[in-house]
Each structure stands twice: as C-alpha cells, then as structure tokens.
Amino acid sequence: MDSEKIKAGIRPAEWYEKENQAMIPRPERIFTVPERICAWGMIALGYGLFRACPVYEYPLGGILLLWALFGLTLFTLRKGGHPVRGMALAVCLSALPVSLAMFCSGNAMIQTAAFLYGMAAYAYTVYAACGNTLEEGLSDLLPMDLLRAVFVLPFGSFGSLVQAVGGGGIWKKSGKILLRVFGGLSLAMLPTLLAVSLLSYDSKFRSSMNDLVSLDLGDLFGHLLDLGLGLLLALYLFGLYTSATEKRCAALLTAAGCRDVAGRMHSFSPVTICSSACPVLFIYGVFFFSQWENYVSAFRGTLPENILYSEYAREGFFELCAVSFLNLVLLTATGMFTRRSDTGTNRAHPAVRVLHVLLAMCTLVLIATAVSKMFLYIEAYGLTPKRVYATWFMVVLTLVFVLVIVKQFVPRLRLIALSMAVCVGMFALLGLTDVEGRIAAYNVDRYLAGTLEEPDFAGLGASAVPEKIRGGLYHPVHPALTEFHTEDWENSNPFTLTLPELRAKAAVAEWGDMQR
C-alpha cells in the first residue's frame, strides 16, 4: 500500500495528514542543501528588507532585495521539482513591472503599494507553484487563494526555519545553539541598552563606552531591531515555503467549502432582489431628469448660466464617485444573495441579469458625468496629483463595470479574477509612467501656451524640476529646491535613488552649465 502511494507521488508527510489527521506525528522533514541555503538567505534578506523600510526612502534597495527573494526561492523551488508555471508564472511576472514603480515613481504611496503587491505576489507564486490553488487556471477563487497564501500557510510551518538552518549532525546542534544564543542576546538587548542609558550620566563611563564601541548606540539598536524583525520575517517566508511544498493546511478554506458557503448565501428570491433595487433605479431616473441641463453640460464643455468653473466642476464630483462605488457594492450584494436558477448552470435569474446591466449602465453614465466635470476643472486650473488619482480611480471603476456587463452575457467570464488583473494593470500603468512628471509637463505646456496663469507644482517633488527649468520657473535659492543641487544629494545613498531624482539631477547639471 505504501509503495503504491509513493509511486503515485504522495509523500509520507501528506498521507499522515490526510488519513490520520493529528493522531500520528508528522515525519521530520529532511531539508536539502538548496533548501538550507534558501533558509539562511531568507534570514539575510529579511534583515535587508527591514533595513530598506520604509521603501519610499530606499526604493532601489527594496527592488533589489525583492528580486533577490524571488530569485532565491524560484531557484530552490525548481531544484525541488516545483517549476513555476501557469498562474504562478503570470503573477510572478506581474510583480516585475509593478515593483519597478518603486524606482520610476517618486510618490511614497505608490512606492509602498508596489512593494506590498510584490510581497503578496511572492506569497502567491510560492503557493501556486506547488499546486495548492483551489482551482486550476484563472479562477474567481483567487482572493481565497491569496488569503490562504498570506495568512494560513506561513503559520502552518512557522518554526521550520529552525530545523532547516540546523543541518544534520554537528551542524544541526550548532545551528540550534546559535539560534538559542541569538534568542538570549535578543532578550538581553533591552535591559542592556537601558542600563547603558542610565549609566551614561557619568562622563568617564561615556568615554569608555565610546572607546569600546565605535558604533553609535542608536544605530546599533536599529541594526539589532532589524535583525530580530528580519528573523521573524524569515520564519514567515520559510514557513510559507515549507507548507506549500508539503501541501499543509489543505483542509482550511477548501474550494468545496467556499462553494458551500456561497450556496447558502443565495437565499433571496429574484423577485425580492429586483424589488429592492427598483427604488434605487427610480432615484437615478429622477436625478438624471432633474440635473439634465446642469450635469450633461459637462459633455458639451460649456457652463450653465450664472455658475463659476470652480463651483460647477467641483460640485457633486465626489458624491458621484461615492454613488458609483455604492453601485458596485449593490451589484456585489445582489449577485451574492440572489437564489440561482434550477437549471444547474448556477446562473442568476434573467431578471437579475437585466438589473445588473441597468445598474452598471447607470453607473457608467454617472462616471462619465463625473469625469467630464473633472476635465472642465482641469481645463480651468491645471493638473494636480489628487485630480489625476481621482480620475484614475474612475477609469478603473469604468473598466470593472464594463466587465460586469459582459459577465451577464458571457457566464464563463471570471469576473473577480479579471477585475483584480485590471486593477493590477492600471496600477502598473500609474506607477511606471511617472505621473508627477507628466503633471508638471502638462502644467508647464499650458503655462507656456498662455492658457494657465500659474502652474501648480505642489507635491510633485523631483519630478517637477526638469519642467520648471524648461518653463523658466526654476529658482535654486528657494529652500524647497535646495535638495536638488547640494552636495548632500550628490553623495546620497545609491539605494535611495529614483528615476525622477536622476532626471532632476541631470536637468539641474545642464541648467548650471548654461548659467556659466
């Protein structure tokens, strides 16, 4: 019987869990040499990743460390017979351009989001490469897979790193001793630093400590803290690897369980759902009728009488955005709670599908009105980051609602997975195009053409410097611009560099040559 299981590719660790549950202890995992190297590498990378935090201060360092983590783990997976294919490969490749946003953009929010996506993509890649996905291919259970990869599997083998770095024989004992010593030193770190701080009132003691330790105590504490946090991150990452390769936690959040929960939620009849949505559709009809002249004028590019640009363009924009998001929630709720037809196709009732199309079309009209109003506002006052991000969000919502409409006619469409892919693609577009630089270029073009009185460069950082020089608006004596031509910038840490800063540096150097 055991030989048949081995021939079928089932390892002992798997059949103990499937047949005997927790009655019989799982056999001790014997880690290979590449896996042990990976374990030590994760400790080093964990320390490095925390040294690079926050990533918006060390964007290039964050990218290199993230790519090193991917490379180390993918090499180990391949050596262990787990090549990255299918969805795992697609998600892995998506992390490459998204992570580059940390270097291409100077926006801290975009850089942080890009790093977080890279880490989430790493977790899913390891999870999917070992065949742990709930369904094959592009599936609407992708959010549940991501949930299992990030929050379940890493803690199923959280302590496996200790065994992996220990090795065998004398190396195993030495590794355990080193970890125990490190644990003891970590526990002693706080009282030791406290004692040093209290005794530093004495000048002779301070002098002795300065002679004994050339490293600044605050810097030393930072390194030790990052090392401790890096060890926790390494435990998390290697726990994910171990659980994924052994297919642990297979009984948690299964595909059958997810479908069973979804089936139980389909409890309301289509008549009830459609009736509940009728008042909302009626309100939208009244809204479109009452505001027809004012709001539709945005499409014509003209203003209603006795209304200012700022008043018209800003009035109601965020309310329209909120209503659009509310409609997305309504569509999700009606899809989740409506009882399915008895044909066995699991499709929603035709009346519910018509309701979804009507809600989506109403939302597209609201989005188009809001975006048109924003374009009028931009035409009058130029671009700012907030205006661009608000418009970007509305475009993303538009694409999602278009997918909702297509879903009603193409039941096999993976709406959730494709919506997530749209969001990732749009975020990559936002991060890789240096939005701040394009905002500055647009404002300077309008300024030079005489259609914009005063360009707004607030919040654009280094991205605005080349455009300020082009528009004759660069004033190096201004305190806010000194960072772009001082020696501190010249001697800055290379891991802090971004593409906008490199462009600004080149533009300032060229401007300086022209002034001589």
Predicted regions and their residues:
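N-terminal signal-anchor module of multipass membrane proteins
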Residues: 1-79
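Transmembrane-helix bundle segments that line or gate the permeation/cavity pathway
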Residues: 50-207, 226-250
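Terminal, non-globular segments
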Residues: 111-113, 117-122, 221-258, 264, ...
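Short aromatic-rich membrane-water interface segments that cap or initiate transmembrane helices
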Residues: 213-228, 305-325, 383-393
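Internal/C-terminal transmembrane anchor helices
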Residues: 274-277, 281, 413-436
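Membrane-embedded alpha-helical segments of integral membrane proteins
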Residues: 358-407
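Hydrophobic alpha-helical transmembrane segments in integral membrane proteins
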Residues: 428-452
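Extracytosolic and intramembrane catalytic regions of membrane-associated proteins
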Residues: 458-516
